[in-house]
Amino acid sequence: MDESGETPNTVTVHGPGEFTGDVAQLSGSPSLVSGVARGDCEVYEVSPDALRQILNNHPDLGDVILQAFIARRQLLKGSGTFTGLRVIGSRYSRDTFRIRDFLAENRMPFTWLDLEADPQVDKLLKEFGLTEADTPVVAWGRKLLLRNPSNRELAETLGIRRPLELEVYDLVVVGAGPAGLAAAVYGASEGLSTVVLERTGPGGQAGRSMRIENYLGFPTGVTGAELAERAVVQAGKFGARLPVGTLVTKLTFDNTYPTLHLEDGETVTAKCLLIATGADYRRLDAEGCAQFEGCGLYYAATFNEAQMCRGSNVALVGGGNSAGQAAVFLAAQARKVYLVIRGNDLHKDMSSYLVQRIEQTPNIELLRNTEVRRMSGDRYLKSIEVVNNKTGEVRTLETAALFSFIGAVPWSEWLSPEIERDAKGFVRTGPAVSQSPYWTPRRQPFLLETSHPGVFAAGDVRSGSVKRVASSVGEGAMAVQFVHEFLKEM
């Protein structure tokens, strides 16, 4: 039964010998639907640990169960009748956007009720005894769950952030992008107690891509969300834990092992640590941009953002693959897309197939040698001012949203001084740290090992890495091999 909407609805009917459940059962998270028996019956409850044993020890049966779990979640999200969580809030509210973004990243089905446009809002707020000033709020069915929750509060309420089960793990991975998820799959499948600490949701930058067309094995392309979701299920099958909404604030080496300090004061110790925190896009440096972050200025282009600008003009800044993928995706939603690049050659940093796609899309206008100088509007973004850095020509473009995909800033400020970084903050590894004063062993560092023995880095956060999904996945898998080598030395 689906009890998330106004009235309960039947999702499906199971008979004798069939099984219930979806991907939430792998982590012990609450189910999205409930069950009602029509008569006397006998039901067997299978715990997450027992379920994993079945999946791993009986692969034929495990394949059937996993495929059913994945399909059921997809059917719920695509049914058009499943409400899921209800988020009530303004399209101009940063917190409303943050909540929607967090739910989307974690593949939690939800319905957004726009404070300015949805006719149900007044009725629902009255039922909950709330006013517009109390929004954003999150509800399930007729039950109010939370008022403007933090990501951590939301994760704990939904059961996707659970207490850590161990004090010491063989492998702690910080970051659930492609590198971190690959390490989780390989580490857990090879018998290492593995936990992935993720501050928002799985997938990283890649998880926000609407179509990756050059990833091996997917000739028709794959969304970043689908790739991340399948990796999470795969890691969970082997026993890796992934408590989202877990922010690491500090790394210390008080004892023999690295100790990670979390936002809530909790600590977790690692025999080996993998830093896979990736890199964020650099914040746009244009006049007025601060007031529009999360309500007109965005750093990803998913369905969440596209809802805000359907049928309007939008602009994108950036010349890499992420910008190209976003431009093509948004062109199907927006009236017009302005693609702004500082240089003259789109081929410099973008794959040829994307350049060709952009050139063949009639509602994408490429603005070469151009930079964004100003963003303007009152409560919401109305226009941007751009300047040609060759001619000095200034244009004002009416836009409902600006998407920025420029630069890369590694998330590494939480690291201790023992972990050497380059001038831009990316983590040094391998031969680059062999002469570091923090490197004490007589052997040379492993290729992905940092300046502290037993601490590794992989993916976009690593200095000198290739910023591609396939490369990050390869580095995450490779790091696990070095983890095994290090553990042999202990």
Regions found by a protein language model. Give the residues of each.
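A short beta-strand-loop-beta hairpin characteristic of the jelly-roll/cupin
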Residues: 1-9
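Short, structured interface segments
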Residues: 49-79, 139-164
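FAD-binding core/adjacent interface of flavoenzyme oxidoreductases
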Residues: 117, 122-174, 189-190, 207-208, ...
